[in-house]
């Protein structure tokens, strides 16, 4: 699972849009998180985690601060979460999470991404039952057994720990995210976390093969990434080098 998870992250990184678009998506997510859960990161752990990820992705401090400041005021924009599921090129499964202030616009944009790339949008729950909501941490290291032992000694429920190509990947139920992050900070500070996120991890992967499918897949992901309302795309496609 670990290598495939890294491949998925890489495929998203390859098609990432301009930095300003990435900043905009983080700004929107931080605004919504602060608006709904409070502007103090110490009291809003979800906000704290989101800010940490934004900084790791080199989002400027002023973008983060402006989003929180905006959330602290009265009124403001109303965003709602929207999720779409379906089958992408090569019959891979896809989950798309959005934040939108105009549901009609968002579904129109997402449908267009599917229809233009030989993909098929599905109904709610059509593929999400084939994904697990997981806390995922990845970092350079060699002693995966020691990492597992440390986490278990801290009474943390760990789904799996994998070591491949010098990268250790920890998977755990999403409810364990902040316990694991705290344990790394307190007990394993020598590890620099390259990935620390809540993700929908597929239970199995599918190879996307054939030149046409590969081209459509890359275009599909790029079009979704270009949609302003799309926050996250999860899929079970594995792309061979």
From Swiss-Prot:
NCBIfam families: PRK12378.1. GO terms for molecular function: DNA binding. PANTHER family: TRANSLATIONAL ACTIVATOR OF CYTOCHROME C OXIDASE 1. Keywords: Cytoplasm, DNA-binding, Transcription, Transcription regulation. Pfam families: TACO1_YebC_N (PF20772), Transcrip_reg (PF01709). GO terms for biological process: regulation of DNA-templated transcription. It is found in: Cytoplasm. This is Probable transcriptional regulatory protein CPS_4169. One of its GO terms (cellular component) is cytosol. Its main location: cytoplasm. HAMAP family: Transcrip_reg_TACO1. Belongs to the TACO1 family.
